[in-house]
Regions:
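Gly/Pro-rich turn-and-neighbor structural signature
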Residues: 82-150
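Alpha-helix initiation and N-capping motif
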Residues: 6, 75, 96-100, 133, ...
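N-terminal-proximal low-complexity accessory segments that begin disordered
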Residues: 1-20
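Arginine residue identity/basic-tract feature
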Residues: 9-11, 53, 69, 94, ...
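Internal helix-loop-helix
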Residues: 17-113, 158
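Terminal targeting/low-complexity segments that flank the catalytic cores of oxidoreductases
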Residues: 4-10, 32, 36, 223
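FAD-binding core of flavoproteins
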Residues: 120, 124-233
């Protein structure tokens, strides 16, 4: 079920090395002198944003489909956090450094990066802490190495991604100033204790001539189950 979208992602990786597309999809890092993926470049100018748009257009025309989760769609969230480094450092001085290091690593390695946003809905009339304790993602322990988390998230493309930026979509913690459910972190998708439960794919169930996009560009949704997963500081 993963082959269609994995083939597309592989094609995007290959395009960056081909003379016909390399100029639109890569840039030379001013510090290291290395050629990196332009989609993950930290934007600082109008020209940076226009270059990203040109790269997206180039990819979409080549692969012949609108694919939204091919590894860089959540990079913008990292850039927003980078802009708020001073605020993050007020919470914990390590957080600002973590964001800067993550942006650098993703840009250099062209990491397949997705989000882990959507929560199992459960009973929406209740606060997170009043529901099934193992359903919504939350911290169960804090150690010198990091936090241990348990619960679930839904995310498209997680099963074939390198990592996910996991964060809450619920903002009501009741009277609590701090909540074990208010979590944001980067997690490798092969972390110990993390399980992937995927829906079936659309490819092969219908005539490709009648349903060309679902056969060629199906992005698989996954239920991520965190079973006491350690998230390092």
């Amino acid at each position: 079920i993963f082959k269609p979208i994995v083939d597309i992602r592989a094609r995007i990786y290959d395009m960056a090395h081909e003379a016909q597309f390399s100029q639109q999809l890569t840039y030379i890092d001013a510090t290291s002198g290395e050629k990196n993926c332009i989609g993950s470049k930290l934007p600082k100018t109008k020209s940076d944003w226009l270059s990203k748009r040109e790269a997206i257009k180039t990819i979409m025309y080549e692969v012949g489909a609108v694919v939204t989760r091919v590894g860089d769609e959540t990079a913008g969230e990292m850039w927003s956090l980078f802009d708020g480094t001073d605020i993050l450092n007020e919470v914990d001085p390590r957080f600002g450094d973590n964001i800067a290091r993550h942006i650098k690593t993703v840009s250099e390695s062209d990491t397949f990066h997705v989000s882990g946003n959507t929560d199992p809905k459960g009973d929406r009339s209740k606060l997170p802490q009043d529901q099934d304790p193992d359903m919504l993602l939350h911290a169960v322990e804090e150690t010198e190495k990091g936090i241990v988390v348990r619960g679930a998230k839904y995310e498209t493309a997680a099963a074939y991604a390198n990592q996910a930026f996991v964060k809450p979509t619920i903002a009501n913690w009741g009277e609590q100033k701090l909540s074990n459910y208010a979590l944001g972190f980067i997690c490798p998708m092969n972390a110990i204790g993390l399980k992937h439960i995927c829906r079936s794919g659309f490819a092969g169930h219908s005539n490709p001539e009648d349903y060309p996009l679902s056969n060629r560009a199906d992005e698989i949704d996954t239920l991520l189950v965190f079973d006491n997963v350690l998230i390092p500081w």
